[in-house]
């Protein structure tokens, strides 16, 4: 197998994709044979799990780029006391041609804007949720019974088409995976010409969760609002 190295052209492709994430607290360090995603301590202290979830979006982007470059990504989540800032490391695995779906997801990286959203059908939400492939994560359609619990977390989903991203636990690794699942589902929506907007959820103590009439599944990490893009109304002069 021919070894993969991040040369000038592949770095340019990756750089263009990462720039499209917009403001991001995660730093991508591109080495010859790997990409190291780090969470700067100064930003981590201020942003809590938001920086890790944004590292997840960067992870999803690196994954997408490696696939169109014809490589299977290999992801590691090191627990290194000497480098506590490292969120994930991505290396290029064996060669495999990208599928048409993966090319579509790569193209969709350019279409992740956040306009006003008009609700979509449950069938659309179900199709998007089914495309999540990140381990130890789930993407579910928000049920009416979950609305009060989400409101306690400061999220208003009334009249919106929403998906809930959860993880099996609440470690640093799971925050990164949640961010990857959130970003990957946004790509799936963009491929279908739907717009989306991510909403990060604060951590909720177990005691508070136990008081809810219908407990949210897993560990809630983020919401994804999905819809048809509508133009923003201009304010009257």
What do the predicted segments below correspond to?
Residues 1-237:
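Acidic, surface-exposed loops and disordered segments
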């Amino acid at each position: 197998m021919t070894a993969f190295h991040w040369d000038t052209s592949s770095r340019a492709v990756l750089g263009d994709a990462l720039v499209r994430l917009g403001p991001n607290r995660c730093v991508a360090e591109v080495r010859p044979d790997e990409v190291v995603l780090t969470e700067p301590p100064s930003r981590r202290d201020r942003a809590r799990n938001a920086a890790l979830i944004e590292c997840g979006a960067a992870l999803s982007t690196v994954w997408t780029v490696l696939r169109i470059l014809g490589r299977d990504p290999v992801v590691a989540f090191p627990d290194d006391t000497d480098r506590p800032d490292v969120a994930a490391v991505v290396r290029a695995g064996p060669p495999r041609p990208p599928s048409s779906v993966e090319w579509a997801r790569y193209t969709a990286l350019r279409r992740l804007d956040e306009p006003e959203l008009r609700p979509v059908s449950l069938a659309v939400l179900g199709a998007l949720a089914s495309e999540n492939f990140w381990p130890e994560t789930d993407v579910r359609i928000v049920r009416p019974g979950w609305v009060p619990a989400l409101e306690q977390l400061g999220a208003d989903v009334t009249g919106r088409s929403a998906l809930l991203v959860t993880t099996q636990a609440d470690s640093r690794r799971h925050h990164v995976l949640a961010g990857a699942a959130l970003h990957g589902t946004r790509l799936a929506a963009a491929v279908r010409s739907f717009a989306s907007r991510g909403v990060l959820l604060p951590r909720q103590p177990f005691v508070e969760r136990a008081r809810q009439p219908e407990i949210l599944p897993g560990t809630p990490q983020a919401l994804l609002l999905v819809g048809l893009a509508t133009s923003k109304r201009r304010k009257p002069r």
